[in-house]
Protein backbone atom coordinates (compact mmCIF):
# COMPACT_ATOMS: atom_id res chain seq x y z
CA UNK A 1 0.00 0.00 0.00
CA UNK A 2 1.12 3.51 -0.78
CA UNK A 3 -0.22 6.89 0.17
CA UNK A 4 -0.45 9.08 -2.91
CA UNK A 5 -0.15 12.85 -2.75
CA UNK A 6 0.72 15.09 -5.72
CA UNK A 7 4.45 15.72 -5.78
CA UNK A 8 5.28 12.94 -3.33
CA UNK A 9 8.56 11.07 -3.36
CA UNK A 10 9.46 7.65 -2.01
CA UNK A 11 12.71 6.40 -0.56
CA UNK A 12 14.16 2.91 -0.54
CA UNK A 13 14.92 0.61 2.33
CA UNK A 14 17.24 1.88 5.03
CA UNK A 15 18.86 0.75 8.24
CA UNK A 16 16.09 2.38 10.27
CA UNK A 17 14.42 0.41 13.08
CA UNK A 18 12.01 -2.20 11.75
CA UNK A 19 8.36 -2.45 12.67
CA UNK A 20 7.73 -4.69 15.64
CA UNK A 21 4.76 -5.55 17.86
CA UNK A 22 2.21 -2.95 18.93
CA UNK A 23 3.60 -2.62 22.43
CA UNK A 24 7.23 -2.05 21.45
CA UNK A 25 8.95 1.20 22.33
CA UNK A 26 9.44 3.53 19.40
CA UNK A 27 12.71 5.31 18.68
CA UNK A 28 12.74 9.08 18.78
CA UNK A 29 12.00 11.06 15.65
CA UNK A 30 15.08 12.05 13.65
CA UNK A 31 15.46 15.79 14.15
CA UNK A 32 17.97 15.98 11.30
CA UNK A 33 15.33 14.64 8.89
CA UNK A 34 12.79 17.39 9.62
CA UNK A 35 12.13 19.76 6.72
CA UNK A 36 11.46 23.38 7.72
CA UNK A 37 9.96 26.16 5.64
CA UNK A 38 11.92 28.80 7.55
CA UNK A 39 15.32 28.98 9.28
CA UNK A 40 15.39 29.23 13.09
CA UNK A 41 15.80 33.00 13.10
CA UNK A 42 12.53 33.42 11.15
CA UNK A 43 10.32 31.18 13.31
CA UNK A 44 9.81 33.26 16.46
CA UNK A 45 6.29 34.55 17.00
CA UNK A 46 4.78 32.51 14.17
CA UNK A 47 2.36 29.58 14.44
CA UNK A 48 3.71 26.14 13.59
CA UNK A 49 2.04 23.68 11.21
CA UNK A 50 3.48 20.16 11.43
CA UNK A 51 3.00 17.75 8.52
CA UNK A 52 2.82 13.99 9.22
CA UNK A 53 3.13 11.72 6.20
CA UNK A 54 1.48 8.36 5.59
CA UNK A 55 2.62 4.75 5.53
CA UNK A 56 5.50 3.98 3.18
CA UNK A 57 6.28 7.62 2.48
CA UNK A 58 8.68 10.22 3.87
CA UNK A 59 8.99 13.84 4.96
CA UNK A 60 9.28 15.11 1.37
CA UNK A 61 5.76 13.93 0.61
CA UNK A 62 3.53 16.50 2.29
CA UNK A 63 6.28 19.11 2.27
CA UNK A 64 5.60 19.37 -1.46
CA UNK A 65 2.35 21.08 -0.45
CA UNK A 66 4.13 23.78 1.56
CA UNK A 67 4.20 26.39 -1.26
CA UNK A 68 0.40 26.21 -1.45
CA UNK A 69 -0.25 26.62 2.29
CA UNK A 70 -0.66 29.99 4.06
CA UNK A 71 2.80 31.60 4.41
CA UNK A 72 2.02 32.85 7.92
CA UNK A 73 2.73 29.35 9.20
CA UNK A 74 6.16 27.96 9.88
CA UNK A 75 5.90 24.49 8.36
CA UNK A 76 7.76 21.43 9.63
CA UNK A 77 7.53 18.05 7.90
CA UNK A 78 8.61 15.18 10.13
CA UNK A 79 9.70 11.64 9.28
CA UNK A 80 8.02 8.64 10.90
CA UNK A 81 10.44 6.59 13.04
CA UNK A 82 9.94 3.05 11.67
CA UNK A 83 10.94 1.32 8.45
CA UNK A 84 8.22 -0.97 7.05
CA UNK A 85 9.03 -4.56 6.06
CA UNK A 86 10.46 -5.19 2.59
CA UNK A 87 9.44 -4.41 -0.13
CA UNK A 88 7.51 -1.38 1.17
CA UNK A 89 9.62 1.79 0.81
CA UNK A 90 9.80 4.78 3.12
CA UNK A 91 8.75 5.01 6.75
CA UNK A 92 5.83 4.20 9.02
CA UNK A 93 4.36 5.32 12.32
CA UNK A 94 3.11 1.89 13.33
CA UNK A 95 2.74 -1.58 11.72
CA UNK A 96 0.18 -1.69 8.94
CA UNK A 97 -1.79 -4.30 10.88
CA UNK A 98 -2.96 -1.32 12.91
CA UNK A 99 -5.41 -0.52 10.13
CA UNK A 100 -7.53 -3.46 11.23
CA UNK A 101 -6.53 -4.12 14.84
CA UNK A 102 -8.51 -2.66 17.73
CA UNK A 103 -5.36 -2.29 19.87
CA UNK A 104 -4.26 1.35 19.60
CA UNK A 105 -1.10 0.88 21.69
CA UNK A 106 1.21 1.39 18.72
CA UNK A 107 -0.56 4.55 17.58
CA UNK A 108 -0.41 5.96 21.10
CA UNK A 109 3.30 5.18 21.37
CA UNK A 110 3.96 6.90 18.05
CA UNK A 111 1.95 9.95 19.10
CA UNK A 112 3.95 10.13 22.33
CA UNK A 113 7.21 9.95 20.35
CA UNK A 114 5.96 12.78 18.16
CA UNK A 115 4.97 14.84 21.21
CA UNK A 116 8.45 14.35 22.65
CA UNK A 117 9.97 15.72 19.44
CA UNK A 118 7.60 18.68 19.48
CA UNK A 119 8.55 19.66 23.02
CA UNK A 120 12.16 19.95 21.93
CA UNK A 121 11.40 21.68 18.64
CA UNK A 122 9.38 24.65 19.86
CA UNK A 123 8.39 26.47 23.03
CA UNK A 124 5.15 25.75 24.84
CA UNK A 125 3.59 29.09 23.88
CA UNK A 126 3.83 28.56 20.11
CA UNK A 127 0.43 27.77 18.55
CA UNK A 128 0.65 24.38 16.83
CA UNK A 129 -1.59 22.82 14.22
CA UNK A 130 -1.23 19.35 12.72
CA UNK A 131 -1.85 18.15 9.17
CA UNK A 132 -1.64 14.44 8.52
CA UNK A 133 -2.29 12.11 5.62
CA UNK A 134 -3.58 8.57 6.18
CA UNK A 135 -1.45 6.98 8.93
CA UNK A 136 -0.04 10.43 9.70
CA UNK A 137 -3.58 11.62 10.41
CA UNK A 138 -4.03 8.82 12.92
CA UNK A 139 -0.98 10.10 14.79
CA UNK A 140 -2.13 13.72 14.53
CA UNK A 141 -5.51 12.87 16.03
CA UNK A 142 -3.96 10.65 18.69
CA UNK A 143 -1.57 13.45 19.67
CA UNK A 144 -4.55 15.79 19.96
CA UNK A 145 -6.32 13.27 22.19
CA UNK A 146 -3.27 12.88 24.44
CA UNK A 147 -2.84 16.64 24.95
CA UNK A 148 -5.98 18.49 23.82
CA UNK A 149 -4.89 21.92 25.01
CA UNK A 150 -1.57 21.85 23.14
CA UNK A 151 -2.92 21.86 19.60
CA UNK A 152 -4.95 24.58 17.92
CA UNK A 153 -6.42 22.33 15.22
CA UNK A 154 -5.94 19.19 13.14
CA UNK A 155 -6.33 18.50 9.42
CA UNK A 156 -7.17 14.83 8.88
CA UNK A 157 -6.71 13.76 5.26
CA UNK A 158 -7.75 10.17 4.50
CA UNK A 159 -7.15 9.11 8.09
CA UNK A 160 -9.14 7.80 11.03
CA UNK A 161 -9.44 7.89 14.82
CA UNK A 162 -7.71 5.05 16.65
CA UNK A 163 -9.93 2.75 18.70
CA UNK A 164 -10.16 2.78 22.47
CA UNK A 165 -10.57 5.42 25.15
CA UNK A 166 -7.93 7.77 26.53
CA UNK A 167 -8.08 9.52 29.93
CA UNK A 168 -7.98 12.91 28.19
CA UNK A 169 -10.91 12.28 25.81
CA UNK A 170 -13.24 14.08 28.22
CA UNK A 171 -11.03 17.16 28.18
CA UNK A 172 -11.00 17.05 24.39
CA UNK A 173 -14.81 16.93 24.28
CA UNK A 174 -14.94 20.03 26.50
CA UNK A 175 -12.42 22.02 24.45
CA UNK A 176 -13.76 20.87 21.05
CA UNK A 177 -10.87 22.12 18.89
CA UNK A 178 -11.51 22.46 15.14
CA UNK A 179 -10.78 19.44 12.96
CA UNK A 180 -11.06 19.26 9.17
CA UNK A 181 -11.65 15.77 7.76
CA UNK A 182 -11.30 15.20 4.05
CA UNK A 183 -11.65 11.79 2.44
CA UNK A 184 -12.27 10.30 -0.97
CA UNK A 185 -15.53 8.54 -1.79
CA UNK A 186 -13.50 5.90 -3.65
CA UNK A 187 -10.84 5.41 -0.97
CA UNK A 188 -10.48 1.63 -0.70
CA UNK A 189 -7.41 1.70 1.56
CA UNK A 190 -8.98 2.72 4.87
CA UNK A 191 -11.28 -0.08 6.14
CA UNK A 192 -14.98 0.78 6.35
CA UNK A 193 -15.02 0.00 10.08
CA UNK A 194 -12.34 2.64 10.71
CA UNK A 195 -14.31 5.22 8.72
CA UNK A 196 -17.54 4.36 10.57
CA UNK A 197 -15.81 4.69 13.94
CA UNK A 198 -14.40 8.08 12.96
CA UNK A 199 -17.80 9.30 11.72
CA UNK A 200 -19.25 8.44 15.12
CA UNK A 201 -16.35 9.60 17.29
CA UNK A 202 -15.19 12.94 15.89
CA UNK A 203 -18.44 14.96 16.15
CA UNK A 204 -18.70 14.04 19.84
CA UNK A 205 -15.23 15.36 20.65
CA UNK A 206 -14.26 18.14 18.22
CA UNK A 207 -15.70 20.95 16.12
CA UNK A 208 -15.80 18.98 12.89
CA UNK A 209 -15.86 20.26 9.35
CA UNK A 210 -14.89 18.59 6.12
CA UNK A 211 -16.00 16.94 2.95
CA UNK A 212 -16.25 13.64 1.08
CA UNK A 213 -14.86 14.07 -2.44
CA UNK A 214 -16.64 12.14 -5.21
CA UNK A 215 -14.28 10.09 -7.35
CA UNK A 216 -11.27 10.66 -5.10
CA UNK A 217 -9.23 7.62 -4.09
CA UNK A 218 -6.60 7.43 -1.33
CA UNK A 219 -4.99 10.71 -2.32
CA UNK A 220 -5.31 14.50 -2.12
CA UNK A 221 -6.95 16.45 -4.92
CA UNK A 222 -6.60 20.10 -5.88
CA UNK A 223 -10.18 20.66 -4.74
CA UNK A 224 -9.42 19.18 -1.34
CA UNK A 225 -6.23 21.20 -1.05
CA UNK A 226 -8.23 24.38 -1.70
CA UNK A 227 -10.59 23.43 1.13
CA UNK A 228 -7.63 22.79 3.42
CA UNK A 229 -6.14 26.20 2.62
CA UNK A 230 -9.48 27.86 3.41
CA UNK A 231 -9.67 25.97 6.72
CA UNK A 232 -6.12 26.98 7.63
CA UNK A 233 -6.93 30.60 6.86
CA UNK A 234 -9.83 30.49 9.32
CA UNK A 235 -7.58 28.98 11.99
CA UNK A 236 -5.03 31.75 11.49
CA UNK A 237 -7.76 34.34 11.98
CA UNK A 238 -8.83 32.62 15.20
CA UNK A 239 -5.36 32.57 16.77
CA UNK A 240 -4.73 35.18 19.46
CA UNK A 241 -2.47 38.05 18.45
CA UNK A 242 1.14 37.66 19.60
CA UNK A 243 3.55 40.47 20.32
Spans of model-derived segments:
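Serine-hydrolase catalytic machinery in alpha/beta-hydrolase-like enzymes
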Residues: 25-126
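Flexible "cap/lid" loop of the alpha/beta hydrolase fold
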Residues: 87-95, 99, 159-179
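Short, proline-enriched alpha-helix->beta-strand connector loops that line the catalytic pocket
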Residues: 126, 174-179, 205-207
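C-terminal catalytic histidine-bearing segment of alpha/beta-hydrolase fold enzymes
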Residues: 193-243
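Short beta-strand/loop motif that positions the catalytic acidic residue
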Residues: 181-183, 187
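A conserved short beta-strand
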Residues: 149-161
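Conserved alpha/beta-hydrolase "nucleophile elbow" surrounding the catalytic nucleophile
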Residues: 53-55, 131-133, 184
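Gly/Ala-rich beta-loop-alpha elbow adjacent to hydrolase catalytic centers
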Residues: 132-136, 140
Amino acid sequence: MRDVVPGCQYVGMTDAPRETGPGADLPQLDDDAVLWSAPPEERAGRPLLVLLHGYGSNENDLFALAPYLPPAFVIAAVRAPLSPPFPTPGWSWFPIEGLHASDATAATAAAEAFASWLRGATDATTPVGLLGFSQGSVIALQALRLDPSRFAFVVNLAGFVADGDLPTDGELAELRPPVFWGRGARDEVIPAARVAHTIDWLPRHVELSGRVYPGLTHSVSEEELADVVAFLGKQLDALPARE
